[in-house]
């Protein structure tokens, strides 16, 4: 029976809200709350810039390890998805709370590594669970938009705390409490087993729009390209001359993610995923470059809107293409490209830490990130040109 007439469609709003909450907690807070917290912890003198960069890389390494671990079939048995998702959500909340102890550097690094594993679990188990209940593109867009909502919520939460002179320790404690409330909401909104739909094989197109390994390289470059800005934007924007803009810039990124997730999936349905991915990567590369104009408030606003509106769109478009490609053997391409993306994310902050300290390191790393995105866009452009030649 077509999914449009399947009873699950009556529950799509509930499922969309559930998916949004999954990534609001798992990614928006679990991963990206660290972005507005980094300048706070640095200003308190708890850690050096280099240490904070390695802590960021540790989180991405944990995410990479979690993506690899949870790609095994043993974790995807229907009876295990719900317990694993709730366990990942509980771990995310507890690990956020653990940051309030302000332990030594090595323990903070370990906490953020484990938080990365938990974030990967929430993304993988949450998205798999949703795909078992609906195939509606609105729900998939809502899932990814949760990242933006979490980013905006987390940044405004930190700003409100700083207004009342709260320490980073108190801010982490409050974030842990907020995570607990989200965990309760997730439990209440969990899709019922009886509404699961029949699994369908991945749709493979006869005309392969690109090789599977080329998509993996492209996505790895995108992971490296975006992560510098996603980690250090509030720190990079301190020279903008507008404290109000500097404070809310990361919120602007988060809010622009939401329409971006819906917009790119709509565009892909109309014009195709590969042309949209090409445009997405080009816009993202330009916006990453524009963040270097940190003394221009207007350019920072434009770059933040464009950056936020594209980087989660990259993920949704790559996942759409990956589901259409043939792969050798039993390779799980969705898991593999996520793995390569994770490697790119680790290398970004690690490179920043190795270059030097402060703004000079950020500028150099940002240029490298923009170059990686331009190369990814070039790969996509070449494949699009080849496809047009073949089909003409």
From Swiss-Prot:
InterPro entries linked: MFS_4, MFS_trans_sf
Transmembrane regions listed in the UniProt entry: 13-33, 55-75, 91-111, 113-133, 138-158, 171-191, 209-229, 248-268, 273-293, 298-318, 331-351, 362-382
Localization per Swiss-Prot or TrEMBL: Cell membrane
Sorted UniProt keywords: Cell membrane, Membrane, Transmembrane, Transmembrane helix
Membrane association type: Multi-pass membrane protein
Record has Protein biosynthesis as a keyword: no
Name under which the protein is recorded: Uncharacterized protein YjiJ
SUPFAM superfamilies named in the record: MFS general substrate transporter (SSF103473)
GO CC aspect terms: plasma membrane
Superkingdom assignment: Bacteria
PANTHER family named among the record's database cross-references: PTHR23537, SUGAR TRANSPORTER
Predominant subcellular localization, coarse grouping: membrane
Cited Pfam families: MFS_4 (PF06779)
